[in-house]
């Protein structure tokens, strides 16, 4: 049987002896019954410390004026001890269940502060935290799918509008490329599937861009960034599609001016390898044209806007410089000549060969025909 420390009193004698406090004050502690009670209390304290540490703190103190016998005193002490254990265990359980609630309230208050763009409120434990919002200075890119298999990457400009960064033509539009099947392209009597695959894929991509240039410019509010650097040729992607990166001033695009281009420009310039009817041979041949616009006068090229109409067609003519090379020349009202385009026959020139020839003979053509 365990007794409560606060309830432990010296047992009253039959003749109305003094209490334990009175004995301590007078120094009267030496009777056998008192020593036995002290030993019993010491052993009980050890058991309480091991089994139910802290239970005695919740025990109610007993009044010192009430006289009880030994059995009643021990019974009351046991009941108080059991009650203290139960109360202590209940208190510990309540503390465990209330901790998540307190933590939940703290997190909820922090989330409310974040959502309202305020500082994090002071937590219940006294800690404070601050949230720093950093502005994103990186270039924002986004991709738009204009048609199935045609993906255009735009860059949002700080002053408004979008800059066209990349056009990608996925090979899913042409299932034969994706499956890596043979593409029959006759070059003489020899078939070159790999070379023909690259040429035909670029031809499809360039044709689509010439036809849909104005629609993309108007629909996506494209305003080219002056710092963009164009590439010479649109590279072929890993999946068989072609990419046109930084299409500003690229040979595949119509001439870009500060004003919006006219409707008839796609047919008049650009590296458009669409089938054309040659005015020299009179037969339908696939030709690739390079915009070789160059004027002998000192007029700025950016201020020149070429519009194809009936009067322009009357002042233009075609000359054959070499077999398979056709040069279109136009006479200007001021008496000067303008080199409109140079066309190469597909039967004799590939794209790389045509560009190399033009770089080597550009000065000669301008001096000879202009």
Curated annotation (Swiss-Prot):
It comes from the Eukaryota. Residues 140-221, 315-370 form the BRX domain. Expressed in roots. The keyword Repeat applies. Keywords: Nucleus, Repeat. Its main location: nucleus. GO terms for cellular component: nucleus. Residues 231-316 are annotated as: Disordered. Disruption phenotype: No visible phenotype. The keyword Nucleus applies. It is found in: Nucleus. PANTHER family: PROTEIN BREVIS RADIX-LIKE 1, PROTEIN BREVIS RADIX-LIKE 3. This is Protein Brevis radix-like 3. It comes from Arabidopsis thaliana (Mouse-ear cress). The gene is BRXL3.
């Amino acid at each position: 049987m365990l007794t409560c420390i606060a309830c432990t009193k010296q047992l009253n004698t039959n003749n109305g002896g003094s209490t334990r406090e009175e004995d301590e004050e007078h120094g009267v502690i030496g009777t056998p019954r008192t020593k036995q009670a002290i030993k019993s209390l010491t052993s009980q304290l050890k058991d309480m410390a091991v089994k139910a540490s802290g239970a005695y703190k919740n025990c109610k103190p007993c009044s010192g004026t009430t006289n009880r016998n030994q059995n009643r005193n021990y019974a009351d002490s046991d009941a108080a001890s059991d009650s203290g254990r139960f109360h202590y265990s209940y208190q510990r359980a309540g503390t465990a269940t209330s901790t998540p609630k307190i933590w939940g309230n703290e997190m909820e208050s922090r989330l409310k502060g974040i959502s309202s763009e305020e500082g994090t409120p002071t937590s219940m434990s006294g800690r404070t935290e601050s949230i720093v919002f950093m502005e994103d200075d990186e270039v924002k890119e986004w991709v738009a799918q204009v048609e199935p298999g045609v993906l255009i990457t735009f860059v949002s400009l700080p002053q408004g509008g979008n800059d066209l960064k990349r056009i990608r033509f996925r090979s899913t539009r042409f299932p034969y490329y994706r499956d890596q099947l043979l593409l029959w392209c006759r070059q003489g009597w020899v078939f070159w599937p790999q070379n023909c695959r690259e040429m035909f894929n670029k031809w499809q991509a360039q044709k689509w861009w010439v036809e849909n240039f104005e629609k993309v410019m108007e629909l996506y509010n494209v305003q080219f960034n002056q710092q963009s650097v164009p590439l010479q040729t649109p590279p072929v992607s890993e999946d068989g599609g072609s990419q046109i990166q930084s299409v500003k001033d690229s040979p595949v695009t119509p001439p870009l001016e500060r004003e919006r281009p006219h409707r008839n420009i796609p047919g008049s310039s650009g590296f458009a390898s669409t089938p054309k009817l040659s005015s020299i041979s009179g037969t339908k041949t696939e030709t690739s044209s390079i915009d070789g616009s160059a004027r002998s006068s000192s007029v700025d090229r950016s201020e020149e806007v070429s519009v194809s109409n009936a009067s322009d067609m009357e002042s233009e003519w075609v000359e054959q410089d070499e077999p398979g090379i056709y040069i279109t020349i136009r006479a200007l009202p001021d008496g000067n000549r303008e080199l409109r385009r140079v066309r190469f026959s597909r039967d004799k020139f590939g794209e790389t060969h045509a560009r190399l020839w033009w770089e080597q003979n550009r000065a000669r053509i301008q001096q000879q025909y202009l």
